[in-house]
């Protein structure tokens, strides 16, 4: 992949991603107590805005930060600012007097979160060789998934004592992340930079195929929006499960999802992005639909299986975005990947809340799962074509050696 120093840097980026994701997912198991009970909210749709406005900031700023970073040729300063700003804004959420103020603060917090996250992703692509994007994204994906897996149950446990505790702990952890960034993360000289923000916005026009991994990023994050908002509310409202146990149910999905990120990313480097992406998407869609049908305690089994097949999707889709982007647009490409992912993440909770309010939780998860399956079927032929071209290219390279 890289030299040993490159490995160390990628692992450091994975650790920072873990800290970031751990911190921002602490609050999810206690949304009922922190949002619904604190501000007397009864609608699932209105409650979902707590997550949706945060992710709306991701949508607006992910591509902007990637482009500015490429243009300046710097990553570290943006990652550091993202951690620090997120720490301050997360603490400020505990002081919000009204729901309206809370939503404004959540939006600003999202600006800093995506600043750190999108540039952590771009930094991995700066280090790894193109043939090892899958492994690089796998390491980053493990950091993200383990952060989610540990943040959710821990947030549920401490949130059962006081729903403000997850925010206090999250703010403190983000300060730790900022300290590690300032001390240990090196500023690398980028090989090239984007010419302008206009170039970033025209990236899809220049390389139309990059829309494929972007679409998978959208739908994968779309379903995650259901898991972080609608799923814990379903457990609390429909099944009467407490916040501590809600975190454990979320962990049943996230642990296998985390453990399999790196090995499946490495497999996609060897066999190609397309096979695991197609198979993972179809099976994952079925698993998501099943979440709304199967009741506890068997729901744990569905969550575990969902985590296994879900891990097939993320590394190859993120790596495919890196494969299709030219060197000058790596940061911009991953900013676009995050942009579409954030669109899905922002839309998921709101659409899930609307459907659940009107038709119930079972229909809500059916919408999420079918969305994944439909995207896989729409792009099936395009992915097969990409796979054929890659196989032919690899064969020609092998014959020329």
Where are the predicted features?
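Juxtamembrane intracellular "pre-TM" segments in multi-pass secondary transporters
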Residues: 1-7, 187-216, 395-401
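Short amphipathic helix-loop junctions that connect adjacent transmembrane helices
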Residues: 30-44, 229-244
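Interfacial helix-cap and linker-helix signal at transmembrane-aqueous boundaries
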Residues: 35-36, 68-69, 154-160, 235-236, ...
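Residue-level signature of mid-helix packing/kink "hotspots" within the transmembrane helices
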Residues: 55-63, 148-149, 254-262, 345-346
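Helix-breaking motifs and short loop linkers at transmembrane-helix boundaries and internal kinks
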Residues: 73, 95-97, 240, 272, ...
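Structural signature of the two symmetry-related core transmembrane helices
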Residues: 77-91, 275-289
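Cytoplasmic helix-loop-helix junction between adjacent transmembrane helices
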Residues: 107-143, 319-320, 324
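Symmetry-related core transmembrane helices of the 12-TM Major Facilitator Superfamily/SLC fold
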Residues: 166-182, 365-381
